[in-house]
Amino acid sequence: MYWISPNNYQVLAQETETDIEKKVLYSSKTKQIIKDNPNLITIHSHPDSFPPSIEDFNSNYENKYGLGIVITHSGIVYMYSSQEHIEPVYYKLKVDEYYLEGYNESESQIKALEYCMSHFDIYFKEVTCDARRGNGYVLRR
């Protein structure tokens, strides 16, 4: 995982080694950087190619990050942010509800996030770029 300054786009911290699968362990140095720098941009990968997890949203809120970016191993990129905590049990129930309707796991998570986005102060979007139209996302310095 990387923490990037929104002011100059410099990497302020990184945690790329972990003994726990699907978990990022923050060093004391990283914790201090997060505390001293609100609105950081975070970037991390999801090897299972799922969208941002509810834990990603809650971490974004609790750590006052400005924007989160998830890059999946299938090549899909998501951006997200959160202005409030969502109970993981609630989110899991919504995912299960969509799964029982016949959606696969990834689709169920996306549907649950869309539902939460309409009922809570969170935001997420798949990042796309249409090169023919010149539409894309560019960070400007």
Each predicted region: which residue ranges?
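Short beta-strand scaffold segments in enzyme catalytic cores
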Residues: 1-7, 68-71
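Detector for glycine-centered tight turns/loop "hinges" at secondary-structure junctions
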Residues: 8-10, 75
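Amphipathic coiled-coil signal-relay and dimerization helices
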Residues: 10-15, 80
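Short HxH-centered metal-ligating active-site micro-motif
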Residues: 16-64, 73
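Divalent-metal-activated hydrolytic enzyme cores
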Residues: 65-141
